[in-house]
Regions:
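Aromatic- and glycine-rich peptidoglycan recognition patches
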Residues: 2, 35-57, 141-191
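Catalytic cysteine-centered active-site loop
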Residues: 56, 75-125, 136
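Intrinsically disordered, low-complexity
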Residues: 2-6, 12-22, 29-75, 186-191
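Short polar/acidic secondary-structure junctions
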Residues: 134-136, 150
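A short catalytic or substrate-binding loop motif that flags glycine-/basic-rich loops and adjacent residues
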Residues: 20, 138-140
Length: 191
C-alpha cells in the first residue's frame, strides 16, 4: 500500500461513522417532516442544535476533503491523469472526492452541472469553482478547482494547474478572474 492509498484508506474509515450518522439523521428528519410518523400531521420544527449538528458535519467533511487534497501538492499535471502519479483538473477533483465515497462525473463540464450554484460572496471551503479553459474565446467550463479558504474574502483554491497541484488565490488574479464562470456547493450530506 503506497502513501496515498494509506491516506485514502484512513480518511475513508475515519469518516465512515460521521457519514453514517449524517445519513441516519437526514433520513430521520426527512421521515418526520414528510409525515411518516404514526400521529396526525403537525407542524414540525427542527431543533436549532440539530441543524447546527448538520452544519458541523458538513464543515468537518469539507475540512477533511481539503486536508486530503493538500497531500497531493506538487504532484505533476498529466492530461487525462486520475492518479497520484499525475492529475488533470477534473481527475484531481474526482480522485479526492472518491476517497470520501463520492462518485462524480469525469469532466469539469459535467462537474459544473452538479450541486447548488453559489455566488462568489457566498463561497465556503469545500465549494467548487469553474473556469473557462486556456482559450478565452470559448465560453464553456474547461477547468475546476476546490476552494480551500475564504478568510477575509480572499478566495484560495487547490487545483491541477499546468505546473502541477498547487494553491492559488482568485482575487485580483489576471488569469483566473476573467476566466471565472460559476461556483457550486456539493451535497456533502447526501453521500
Amino acid at each position: 500500500m503506497n502513501k496515498f492509498q494509506e491516506i485514502s484508506y484512513n480518511f475513508a474509515f475515519s469518516m465512515m461513522g460521521k457519514v453514517t450518522y449524517s445519513i441516519f439523521l437526514a433520513f430521520c428528519l426527512f421521515t418526520v417532516k414528510m409525515g411518516c410518523a404514526q400521529q396526525e400531521s403537525q407542524d414540525f420544527i427542527v431543533p436549532e442544535d440539530s441543524m447546527q449538528n448538520l452544519d458541523d458535519i458538513v464543515s468537518q467533511k469539507s475540512t477533511a476533503i481539503i486536508e486530503y487534497a493538500k497531500n497531493f501538492l506538487g504532484v505533476p499535471y498529466v492530461w487525462g491523469g486520475m492518479s497520484p502519479s499525475g492529475f488533470d483538473c477534473s481527475g484531481f477533483i474526482n480522485y479526492v472526492f472518491k476517497g470520501f465515497g463520492f462518485n462524480l462525473t469525469r469532466t469539469s463540464y459535467g462537474l459544473a452541472e452538479l450541486g447548488k450554484t453559489v455566488r462568489l460572496s457566498e463561497l465556503q471551503p469545500g465549494d467548487l469553482m469553474f473556469f473557462k479553459g486556456r482559450n478565452m474565446s470559448v465560453n464553456r467550463v474547461g477547468h475546476v478547482a476546490l476552494v480551500v479558504d475564504t478568510t477575509d474574502g480572499v478566495i484560495q483554491f487547490i487545483h491541477a494547474a499546468r505546473t502541477g497541484i498547487r494553491i492559488d488565490t482568485f482575487n485580483n488574479s489576471s488569469y483566473y478572474v476573467p476566466r471565472y464562470i460559476k461556483s457550486k456547493r456539493m451535497d456533502y450530506i447526501g453521500y
